Amino acid sequence: MALSLEAYEQDIDELISDEKSCCLDVTDSSDVEGDELNDLELNPFDGLPYSSRFYKLLKERETLPIWKIKYDFLEHLAHNQIVVVSAGPKSGKSSQIPQWCAEYCLAGHYQHGAVVCTQAHKQTAVWLAMRVADEMDVNIGHEVGYIVPFENCCTSETILRYCTDEMLRREMMSNPLLSSYGVVIIDDVYERFVSTDVLLSFLKVIAVSRPELKVVIITCPSLSGTLVSYYGNAPLVEAENTHSVESVYTTSLPRDYFHSALRLLFEIHHTKEKGDIVVFLACEEEIKRAYEHIKQEALHMNPELGELMPIALYPHQSISDYIPYEELDDNSKNPKRKVVLTTSLGESLIWMKNIFFVIDVGIEKRKVYNTRIRAESLVTQPISKVRAKMRKHILSSSSEGKLFCLYPEDFAHEMKPFLTAKVEECNLISMVLFLKRMDIAGLAHCDFINRPDPESLMQALEDLDYLAALDNDGNLSEFGIIMSEFPLDPQLSKSILAACEFDCVDEMLTLAAMVTAPNCFIDLPPEAKELDLIGKGKFFHPEGDHFTLINIYNEYEQMKRNNASQYDVEKWCQNHCLSFVALEMARAIRNELLDIMRRIELPLTGPAFGSDENVTNIKKSLLSGYFMQIARDVDGLGNYIMLTHKQVGQLHPDSGFCNSAKVPEWVLFHEFSVSERSCIRIVSEISPNLFMEFVPPYYFSNLPPSETKDLLQQDQTPDTPPTEEPREEEPLHEANDEGTAEQRCIIQ
């Protein structure tokens, strides 16, 4: 029987009382041997005696700014269903609040479930789980664990789970009311990712259906008022970080903010003042440039200044490359000053304690989706006031840190107050597919904090219709349901389903993993261009980049099957200018996709890569999902005009066709981005006839008149006319084999 509210309140009061006395005992017994304390106290989470490290970390935790609100927070949690917490970076919010919620659930004997805490970045989720397991004196992967894309480090016994907001959103497809959790914590709300906003909206509904569920929303001070109102005047608990910070502004905007930031960095280093430095740049490309520049300059510096150690912190980098804490320290006698280079999205990844200086260029480059041209543009714009204020919290709380703003103070006053929510500036097709899976019909009436752009919603619905993911009533079709099972872009999911019909599942799973993982090609400086060409040339496939990626993965997998050591595999990657981390990620993704295929009982086929028939089948599968991404070379020089609009793009430098004597006339591309040099990435040659065979007639007829469209109709052979066909495609089976196909596609 569920515990009553009065019983919960009594347990919480006892918990708070016990916590206070425990803390007093630890303080008063500082001279007592650790073994004596261990004999007295048992960890309530695993029943084992506390280690001496637990008490050491407890004293560190008590110094965190967030610790001051612990008992106030627990009291609000006991008496309210939804609690909003306002706290800045490095306050301890992400590590301490989940532990307090675990204590709350422990007091209630886990009657209503465990605790889950979402993070905006997978790196943060992994590191926080490890750190919190250490602080709670329990085992990672047992009492405390994490779930991130393509990695699950939890068991049924886990009482505190860290995960990305995307993973919790996907869990809702099989567990709509999140019934396995007693407390749901949404952290880093200010990032305003699409999955974050979707969770915030759904939790309002779930809270009504589950009165026993507790919801904790953690955000920055600037957004707390909005969230309090959004959740019907929910109680607000504020953790103030009051340490002094000196802000230094420039008199005018620098012409070159990038080099101005580097000059200031070197000036600080020459003063010999102690402390590490964080530099916020506009984009990841600038992080790479700054890293190489600092490495070169450091070689010529006076050794008496101490070593300058740059750390490139990419928000979307691999977990294995991420070192967030004192692990960066070493035992060297020579002083080292760490310089963290990151972007605005890297704020929550910075955990170093000794940061005395922050340099902020005040500019960021954001990817904004343009519905008209179906492409992302890299937009340069000033940061928001929320970002500007949060820079101060990065500085060490024990010092009088300095924040150098490379913009005038009046420029700061003109910044927009909040970050733009991602639901207002990204492609919404994956979100709409999820909402349809959750039986949300009136998309325009979903209660988001910021409403998505109606045009973006309409285009997402239209694209899902073209992909045969919707039936005639606008609900998910059988294909749409299966597509939603994959953690992929719907177009890629559709290509995998088509591969089931064309007997090339093995190759499509490999390709899906390679395009989902980070770029496998390493960026080399211009002087190493020849080495780059030799490395990539071995894997080049004349049909295009999709096939080149399959070649690369197959070679890498062959090394693994031959039981090569990790050193040999990494050396092989280095010799061919490939990223070992990216290929490892692709392998993990492929295994996850293979597990999904088996779980929903989709047909699998063995490898057949290399034959002409297999190449054609792969192209057919790709066209089934990417028929909206076709381009034609207009001048024989690699300038491609898109079929869906009149934008022109060039081949990406990583494309194998860049080094070919002749470029193909018609190509299918994976991605088109608008920037200083608009590029199409991952392209393969196709024939107009093959395209006309697989393009949905109602999509082709809706295309605006153009020369490219006319050429496609003229080049069409008599045996492949664009005749009207049934509205819904059946790529998994032939029309006369319906009964068999239904047995092959089962959602469990």
UniProtKB/Swiss-Prot annotation:
Its main location: nucleus. This is Putative pre-mRNA-splicing factor ATP-dependent RNA helicase DHX32. Belongs to the DEAD box helicase family. DEAH subfamily. Residues 706-748 are annotated as: Disordered. The lineage of its organism: Eukaryota, Metazoa, Chordata, Craniata, Vertebrata. Keywords: ATP-binding, Helicase, Hydrolase, Mitochondrion, Nucleotide-binding, Nucleus. It is found in: Nucleus; Mitochondrion. The keyword Transmembrane does not apply.
